[in-house]
Amino acid sequence: RGLAWAMLGFSEEIEMVESIPEASFSEKNQKADVLKMMLKGAQATCDFYIKNTPVCGIPYWDTGAPGLHKLGDYLARPADPYNDFEPVDSSAAAIGAQGLLRLGHYLKKQGKDDLGAKYWQAGLSIVKSLLSEPYLSTSPNHQGLLLHSIYHHPNNWDYVPSGKSISSGESSQWGDYHFREVILYLHKMLKKETYYTFFSFIDNPNS
């Protein structure tokens, strides 16, 4: 999940820096240099995510999880939240998807259509997975929206269903938050409306 925070963080920071006038930057830290650094970080983290995540776009809780080797060629097939070795983390997928989408959108605006499409389509693929079972909660008896989120696996803070060896089936506040946020982002984009950013209030304090 830390990787996903970085993916989204770099992409959102790029949007913010892009909105700041050139005159606000110093000679030692010019706008183009800051954007170049942020873009390098965004692409590095997003590329790592794409390379080390199963084809459905939903990651296991850690790319270095000790039990992943027991799953065989786990990257070549959809993640299995009900496996017996390592839990998936849908909250990381919700966070990472938004980072991919925002990066893809930025690159397209810069005229890099093919590169932008790579990240945009990866983000859409993740959202498609999250909007389907087993990740989308469809039971009226469950209060969460996004299933198979992880709190802190090493500390054993997660609920393990009866008869199972690893955690599954639960939601988290950050998972549900970022799930809703990425859906709202896409909704705004599809309607060609201004999408929300964390810095929007600077110019529109009442927004």
Q: What spans do the regions from the language model cover?
A:
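Glycan-recognition and catalytic cores of secretory/periplasmic carbohydrate-active enzymes
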Residues: 1-207
